[in-house]
Amino acid sequence: MEEVNVHEDLKGVILYAKPEYDDEVKQDWLILVESIKRERHFRSNDLHIYRHASYGLRNGVFYCGEIPGNWGFANGFKFYLPTEKQKIEFIKKIAKEGYKYISVLNKLVKKT
């Protein structure tokens, strides 16, 4: 898969997190959520955090809503473009399992 850098001020990001965590992944996720909550520019409809089983990548899967059709896997905060088949399978999985989301903020905050 092609790897591209993620701009730290991306808006309209949808971030998917695993519903089941080992302690290390859970800690990383809590750090990320707290970092996002501390940001001052709050717009509830800009960043949606989902509890969703990822493809086994540590920090889950995200979709950048500002760039139409720009789907990606997040591992750390590097961005990987999936195949069309992977996108379709992922959409079907979300539709089937019906995960709820929490609206949080307007940008993805890099983990320190």
What are the roles of these predicted feature ranges?
Residues 9-12, 23-25, 47, 60, ...:
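Intrinsic-disorder/low-complexity loop/linker signature
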Residues 25-88:
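Acidic, low-complexity, intrinsically disordered interaction modules
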Residues 1-11, 85, 109-112:
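Short intrinsically disordered terminal tails
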Residues 4-32:
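Short coil-to-beta transition motif at edge beta-strands of beta-rich domains
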Residues 75-112:
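Mixed-charge, Lys/Arg-enriched low-complexity segments
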Residues 14, 19, 53-55, 99-103, ...:
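Assembly/interface hotspot detector across virion components, adhesins/toxins, and nucleic-acid enzymes
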